[in-house]
A protein has these predicted regions:
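A short, solvent-exposed beta-edge/loop patch
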Residues: 165-189, 316-343
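Bacterial N-terminal signal peptides that target proteins for export
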Residues: 1-5
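Charge-rich, low-complexity N-terminal segments
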Residues: 191-197, 205-261
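Long, solvent-exposed N-terminal ectodomains/accessory regions
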Residues: 48-89
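Surface-exposed amphipathic alpha-helical segments
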Residues: 29, 35-42, 184-221, 332-368
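Bacterial N-terminal signal peptides
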Residues: 6-15
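Signature of long, low-cysteine stretches enriched in small and polar/charged residues
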Residues: 74-175, 238-326
């Protein structure tokens, strides 16, 4: 009878294990990890901004870190990933790039007319020959530059794409994949940039949340570039658990020798916040932390409301990293956003309610 009970108990445990929540596998840069609970990535807010312009990935207008995007050492490529959107916005991004070029050309044309008027004034006021010559050289440079300012579209046979650049070299392109826009910009395009864009597009794979492609490559939110594992990179992106949207964690992963620092995207005010000492009490955060199997220290501060005040909300910040000198950098930065920011409905939870959950995630990080 004892054996039967034991066998039944074993079967029950096996069934419970089978019904348990599957691990949420994800990746960033050249790392992979498991999340203890559902989360979301910050992405580019395509409805508000043009992907060619400045700005990184966000959760909402005021809830975000700074400098969230992907750098890939393939002609100094910069990549941004949009939030889920429509085909219409994909078309709009293409039009925005063309329109921006036209605006830039118009500014140069206006500048040319201003400099021509200035040349007339200089001559009328009998400025020196050298001054007149300098002004004529400025005008000549503008006259040579203006005809070259034009966006050319290149048909490289890549499905659902727009490829733009100069007449000789394409250097930026948009891909429409899985209801998202992926924007790629080559800051230093090679002579054979057209072929390199075709090669990169062939190696790029759009993916779903919690879907981790096989093989070496550089991972980003909803995307993956397959490669030989040797290309340099720098990926910074934020995530937040859906259960605690007031707290975000920015993860940084950069290849050895990259210029990335664990403090990228932070300001002096993140380390030394201004606050009313009559309302909040400041204390230090310093505790043991793990990124992968490497132990490090999580350091930061917390502002807790004093019990004698009516204030209920709090704020805190913490940062930890491993690597960067002799091995690839992996860093974690934690930020909070108070109730009411962009419609956040809850008070900021204390560090002890969130850090252990982040720790479960960071401790599972493994490099490719």
């Amino acid at each position: 009878m004892t054996r039967i009970i034991a066998t039944f108990a074993g079967l029950l445990l096996g069934t419970q294990s089978a019904l348990a929540e599957p691990a949420l596998h994800e990746c960033l840069g050249r790392t992979r990890f498991e999340s203890p609970e559902a989360f979301e990535w910050a992405t580019f807010a395509i409805e508000r901004s043009n992907m060619k312009g400045a700005g990184g990935h966000v959760f909402s207008k005021n809830v975000h870190a700074v400098g969230d995007y992907v750098s890939y050492d393939f002609d100094e490529l910069t990549i941004r990933v949009s939030d889920a959107t429509t085909r219409e916005n994909f078309e709009r991004q293409r039009n925005a790039i063309v329109h921006e070029t036209e605006l830039y050309k118009k500014r140069l044309e206006d500048k040319l007319e201003t400099n021509k008027d200035l040349l007339v004034s200089i001559k009328e006021m009998n400025y020196s020959h050298d001054e007149v010559k300098k002004q004529e050289e400025r005008i000549k440079k503008l006259e040579e530059q203006i005809p070259k300012v034009k966006n050319y579209e290149h048909d490289l046979g890549i499905p659902d794409s727009y490829v733009l650049g100069s007449k000789e070299k394409p250097y930026e392109f948009l891909l429409w994949r899985n209801n998202r826009v992926f924007y790629f910009n080559m800051n230093k395009p090679a002579e054979n940039s057209a072929q390199r864009i075709k090669d990169l597009a062939a190696r790029f794979e759009a993916r779903d949340l919690y879907e981790v492609p096989e093989g070496p490559g550089v991972c980003m939110p909803y995307g993956f570039i397959h490669d030989d594992g040797k290309t340099g990179f720098n990926v910074k992106n934020s995530l937040r658990f859906t259960s605690t949207p007031n707290v975000i964690m920015s993860l940084i992963n950069a290849s050895l020798g990259n210029h990335a620092k664990p403090t990228d995207g932070t300001y002096d005010t993140d380390y030394r916040p201004g606050y009313d000492a009559e309302i909040w009490k400041k204390s230090k955060i310093m505790e043991r932390f793990y990124i992968g199997d490497r132990m490090t220290t999580l350091e930061g501060w917390r502002l807790d409301p004093r019990p004698e005040t009516t204030e209920q909300d709090r704020a805190w910040f913490a940062i930890a990293h491993v690597g960067g000198l002799a091995s690839p950098l992996i860093a974690a930065q934690m930020f909070t956003f108070q109730k009411g920011t962009d419609g956040l409905k809850d008070l900021v939870p204390p560090p002890e309610a969130v850090v252990p959950r982040f720790l479960k995630l960071t401790r599972s990080i493994r490099e490719q």
